[in-house]
C-alpha cells in the first residue's frame, strides 16, 4: 500500500462523529458509564483527532507533545494523567481556535526496567512490553485524550529501530560516536554498567549487588563537541528557569588555564591540570592525582622504579577507591580526606620549585584532566587535605594586599596577589591574565575553556535495547575455523565497520536466555549465530553492546511527524508542517539527561541538514508530582497508589480530569485527597442539570456581563495553563445560571464550549442534547466583548469563620440582601452552615463577605 503523506491530507476530521440519532436525547440523569465509552467510540470511528495540516497558513499550527511513558507492568496511577490532561486541554482549545493540532502518543519501551521486570517474572521482555502497552493504551483511551492514534509508535518497533540505528550511523560517520576505555561502575550480578546515582555504599541500588570501578570498552557520544551551543542556545527557549539552570550547571562551562607540570622520573614527562584560578599558581604546594590517572597506574608498575611498599600502598588505595562511586567519594571527602604520597615530584612551571605528588580520591578521573594543582591557602578541599597531612599552606591572595603569617581557613574570594613575585599587587582578574601570558611565553600553559559535561557513555551490556549497527573483523588462529563453534579468534575492536544503511534495522535475535552475566560483552555474545557472520570469505562479529533507553527518546518527536515513512525518518514536508514542538510537557526529573541528549541529537541533525531549527522544544512545562494521600510519593511498596480505573469506574473520566486540574497549579506538588472529588462530581452534575433544563431565548444584563467575564477569565487561564482557576471561574458561572428560572440558551451553549476541553464527554453529550449533530471538537471558541467585562461587577471572596470558602460575582452596588443570597447559595458555604446557627453576616461592599456560624 502506498505511504500516505500525512502533511498533505485534507479529510474533514469533524465529520461523522455523533452517536446514533436513535439514542435517547433526554436522559433523566447523567450516566458517565454509558456516555463516556459512547463518545470515545464516536471519536475513534470518526477519526476526529487525526492531525491534518491545512493549506491555509493563516490557521497556524500547534505541536503539543507529552514526554511519552515507559509502559510499566502496573499501568497508570492517578499521577500519570496530570500532564496528559493538561496537554489535552491545550490541544482541544487550540482546535477550537481554528489552529491545526498535532497531539500524539507512543511508548518508550526499551531499557533496563523492562528487562528486569521480564527477568523477575520469567517472561520475555517483548511479551511483557506488548501487554503493558495494551494496558496503558486502554487507560489513556478511557480518559478521553484526543491523540491521533494513527501515529502511535514504539521504540521497539523494527521500523522505528531502523531509524534510531540510522541516526547512530550519522553520528559515527561524523566522528561523534567512538569507542574508548573508560572507568565505569560495573556490576557483575546485573551484568551492566551503572550510573553513579545507582550505586550506594559500593553496591547496586537494585538488588544490593557489589559494584566495582573498572575500565571497560564503551561506545561514547561526543556531546562535549556541542557543549558551547547547548549552553548558549538555552536563551532561545521558553523553559522553566530551574531547568535552564540545571542544564547550565550540568554543562558547567568554566574559563581558566591549562597548565603543564613536569614530572621527574615519568617517561611521559609532564601532566596537565586545569584551573579557574591561575592567579593562585604561586601558592601551589602539592599536586593531586585521581586514582584513575595514567600516572597513578604507571606508579603501581615495576617500570616506575618505586619501592614495593610504596607501590603496594598506592595499589591498595586505588583498589579501595574502585569500590566507591564518584558520588560516594565526594561525600566521604566532605567528611574526611584521605590520600597517599606517591614519592614523585612535580616541577612548578614558573618557579622551578619541586612539589610532592599525592593520590587522593577527592579528585575524580572523569573530571578535567584527573589531576589538580593544590593551593591550600585558597581552596577549601586543598586546605583540609593539607591540614590532615601537614603540607604547607601559603597565602598568595589577600583581600587588601596585607600579609598573614597563618591562615585559619582558605580565602577563596578575589583580592590582591601577594608572595607571588612578579605578580605582586595585581588584582585577581588582572593577575589571571598576567599568569596565563607568562605561561604561554614559557610554553607551559594556555588559556582554556573547560566543561563539567563528559562525553556520553552510550553502550549497555544488556539484551533489551537497540543493537548498535557496527561490526568488526575477526582474526582466526585457524583460517578454516568457525568462531560460532568455538574456534580461537580475536575480534578487532580497533577496526569498527558501519553496517550498510540498506541492511537496517539490525534486529535483536530471539534469545531465550537473555540473563546478564559477568561477561562485559553482554548477553548478545551468546547469540553466536547472530553475532558472527561471513562475507566474501571473511568472518566478522557484530557489536554485542546495545543502546541505552535514552536512544529511542532522543528523536521520537521527529518520527511522530511521519511514522509510516519507510524511505526516510520523516519527510521534509512533514517537518515543515509541524516542527518545532510548540509545547512539551513532562516531569522535572527529565530536566537534564533526556532533554540534554535530545537537544544534542537534534543539533547534530541540524548540522547535517536534516532539521531546520536549532532547538526541538520551544516551550517546556513540568507538571508537579501528585502525592499519595499520606503526602508521600505514590509507590506499590508504600501501598498508596490510586488506580485511575477505580476513579473512572466510580465517577467518570471527566471527573478525574477536572479534579486533577482543580487540585492546584499545574506545576505544584500536591497530595491526592479522595474526599474532595465529590465537589467536582457535584459541579459536573450541576452543569448537566443546568444545561438540560428548559432554556430561555432572552438574556438579562447581569448574566450577559458574567458570561463575558467568564469567557475572558477561562480563555486567559487556559492560555496561561492556570487550569484550576479556569475551573473555579466556570463553577461561579454555573452557580449563577443554576439560580435562574430558565437559563439563557446562548449562555448555556457557550458554557458547554468552555467546559469541553476539561470535560469533553460531558460537553459532547450536552452539545447533542441541545440540538447539534456534529462533534463540538472544532466549533469556534467563544469570544467575549470587553465592554461587558469592564463594568460594575466584582468577584467577591466569601469567608466562613475566617477562611475563604468561595467567591461570588456581585455588582458594586449590590445590597446586603443580594450579597447574603449569593454567598449562602454557594455549595461550600451551604455545607459548612448546614445545621448551624448563623451568628454574624458582614458585607463590606465591593470587598468581602464574612460569615460566622457556630
Curated annotation (Swiss-Prot):
Comp. bias intervals (Basic and acidic residues): 23-32
Sequence segments annotated as region (Disordered): 1-32
Listed InterPro entries: aa-tRNA-synth_Ia, Leu-tRNA-ligase, Leu_tRNA-synth_edit, M/V/L/I-tRNA-synth_anticd-bd, Methionyl/Leucyl_tRNA_Synth, Rossmann-like_a/b/a_fold, tRNAsynth_Ia_anticodon-bd, Val/Leu/Ile-tRNA-synth_edit
A Pfam cross-reference name: tRNA-synt_1
SUPFAM superfamilies assigned: Anticodon-binding domain of a subclass of class I aminoacyl-tRNA synthetases, Nucleotidylyl transferase, ValRS/IleRS/LeuRS editing domain
Binding site residues for ATP: 636
'HIGH' region, short sequence motif: residues: 69-80
GO cellular component: cytoplasm
Regions crossing the membrane: none
Localization (cell): Cytoplasm
Enzyme class, broadest EC rank: ligase
EC number annotated for this UniProt entry: 6.1.1.4
GO biological process, one term: leucyl-tRNA aminoacylation
Catalytic activity field: tRNA(Leu) + L-leucine + ATP = L-leucyl-tRNA(Leu) + AMP + diphosphate
Extent of motif 'KMSKS' region: 633-637
Annotated GO MF terms: aminoacyl-tRNA deacylase activity; ATP binding; leucine-tRNA ligase activity
The family this protein is said to belong to: Belongs to the class-I aminoacyl-tRNA synthetase family.
Protein name listed in UniProt: Leucine--tRNA ligase
Designated gene of the protein: leuS
